[in-house]
């Protein structure tokens, strides 16, 4: 609602609750749930809310595995300007981000991962094929934020032998 700590933000507000059951019902029908950044007070007043906050709150409420943000920027960048392909929540919080919209997206991505969403992605809507590249290639096209490092290599141990044999067995033929 538009009043926080005694300050009236007029027609701007925050998400107070999400109809998770309604959203899941739409998704269960294999339909797309299109959500606007508008909220309604109990009195019927209309408030503008942050689209990234709506996405964050809905993703958490429905138990989403993944949350994808589209922005002009292709993702988060290191101090040297290099695109960060993946990072943990802690390392994302530590980034010094100047752009206000990038801060909002980073904050929503980190909060959603902290509250149960496995992965959040920040991609550019200006790059053709960015979504497909992010989802179906090793390096992706933007920034992946996750609670823990998403991809880690480790040395095989004795417990891995059965799985390794299963993987290479078709190659023996």
Predicted feature residues:
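C-terminal catalytic "cap/lid" subdomain
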Residues: 1-172
């Amino acid at each position: 609602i538009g009043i926080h700590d005694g300050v009236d933000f007029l027609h701007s507000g925050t998400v107070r609750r999400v109809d998770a059951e309604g959203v899941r019902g739409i998704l269960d029908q294999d339909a797309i749930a299109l959500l606007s950044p508008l909220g309604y007070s109990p009195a019927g007043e209309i408030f503008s809310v942050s689209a990234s906050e709506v996405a964050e709150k809905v993703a958490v409420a429905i138990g989403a595995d993944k949350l994808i943000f589209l922005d002009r920027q292709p993702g988060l960048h290191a101090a040297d300007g290099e695109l960060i392909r993946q990072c943990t929540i802690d390392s994302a919080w530590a980034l010094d981000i100047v752009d206000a919209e990038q801060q909002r997206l980073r904050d929503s991505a980190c909060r959603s991962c902290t509250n149960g969403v496995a992965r959040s992605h920040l991609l550019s809507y200006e790059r053709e094929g960015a979504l497909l590249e992010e989802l179906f290639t090793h390096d992706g096209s933007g920034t992946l934020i996750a609670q823990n490092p998403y991809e880690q290599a480790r040395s095989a141990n004795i417990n891995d032998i059965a799985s390794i044999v299963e993987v290479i067995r078709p190659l023996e033929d």
